[in-house]
């Protein structure tokens, strides 16, 4: 990479693919940004490419995805994607490095004291470990989102209130370590590339409380109840699998001409949002005051 006032700089990753596309005229570099983080220098390119919308080539297939903490995702097909828990596995080393950094001579703005070399080295190790955890989490989400988009024409996800869920101090770290918002972002832009659809279920749709067999909605469902037992038809099923099947049923039972519909907690029909290849979402916001009623359930959801 040739940078202004610096010259030619070797990169760790190969840039031959980008160079070939630029030489062929199928890509044009608009800008390059050099940044420093986790003890390493990075250069990122903003490239303009021509990407045409692709029509779905797969047979019609709908999959519901229920994200959680115990399992990363449960699909309506019955597949359970385990949660790798990268952050939990690195906590022991992070705490050890934190105690080690506390014993080093750090900076002091009052006296103008500079940090010691060992303090800088310890914090660089902490930054590299955090970067490793973030990269491992992002890599797992990329693999899952790519597999779902390539094997299904419609992916149904929930409009989760992640900002409200992390207010639960007991589950905040576990929820943040899953990357629910990042998963939805990846699925949406990858579906736009391949011509698939992403259906975003309404935030107030009771997917966990609704029986996937008969459609009856339970009044209460505690977080400790991992098995959903319907009092109407007697069906017994894992609560996460039940929620995933309900999400898939939103699209399977809807009409393409009028858009997918679902039921509010009170039973009234409401419009869901479908993100197509253009990335445009349609629908209406939740009713006024519903956030306070559903905040307790959303903050303890897994």
What are the residue ranges of the model-derived segments?
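Short, glycine/acidic-enriched loop or turn micro-motifs at the edges of active sites
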Residues: 69-71, 162, 243
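Short loop/hinge segments at the start of secondary-structure elements
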Residues: 1-109, 184
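RNase H catalytic domain
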Residues: 160-176
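Short, conserved catalytic/metal-binding motifs centered on acidic residues
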Residues: 65-66, 148, 155, 187, ...
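Positively charged, low-complexity nucleic-acid-binding target-recognition regions
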Residues: 54, 174, 178-302
């Amino acid at each position: 990479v040739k940078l202004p006032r610096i010259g030619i700089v070797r990169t760790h990753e190969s840039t031959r693919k980008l160079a070939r596309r630029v030489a062929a005229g199928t890509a044009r570099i608009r800008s390059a940004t050099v940044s420093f983080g986790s003890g390493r220098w990075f250069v990122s390119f903003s490239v303009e490419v021509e990407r045409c919308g692709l029509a779905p080539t797969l047979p019609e297939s709908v999959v519901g995805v229920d994200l959680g903490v115990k399992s990363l995702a449960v699909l309506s097909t019955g597949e359970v994607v385990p949660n790798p828990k990268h952050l939990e596995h690195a906590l022991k080393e992070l705490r050890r490095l934190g105690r080690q950094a506390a014993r080093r001579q750090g900076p002091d703005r009052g006296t103008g004291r500079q940090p010691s070399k060992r303090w800088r080295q310890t914090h660089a190790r902490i930054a590299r470990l955090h970067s490793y955890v973030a990269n491992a989490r992002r890599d797992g989400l990329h693999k899952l989102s790519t597999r779902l988009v390539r094997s299904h024409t419609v992916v149904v996800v929930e409009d989760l209130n992640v900002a409200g869920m992390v207010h639960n101090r007991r589950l905040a770290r576990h929820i943040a370590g899953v990357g629910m918002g990042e998963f939805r972002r990846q699925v949406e832009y990858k579906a736009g590339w391949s011509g698939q659809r992403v259906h975003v279920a309404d935030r107030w749709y009771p997917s966990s409380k609704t029986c996937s067999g008969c459609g009856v909605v339970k009044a209460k469902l505690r977080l400790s109840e991992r098995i959903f037992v319907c009092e109407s038809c007697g069906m017994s099923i894992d609560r996460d699998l039940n929620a995933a099947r309900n999400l898939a049923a939103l699209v399977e039972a809807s009409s393409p001409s009028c858009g997918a519909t679902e039921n509010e907690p009170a039973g009234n029909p409401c419009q869901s949002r479908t993100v197509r290849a253009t990335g445009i979402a349609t629908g209406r916001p939740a009713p006024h005051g519903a956030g306070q009623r559903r905040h307790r359930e959303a903050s303890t959801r897994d």
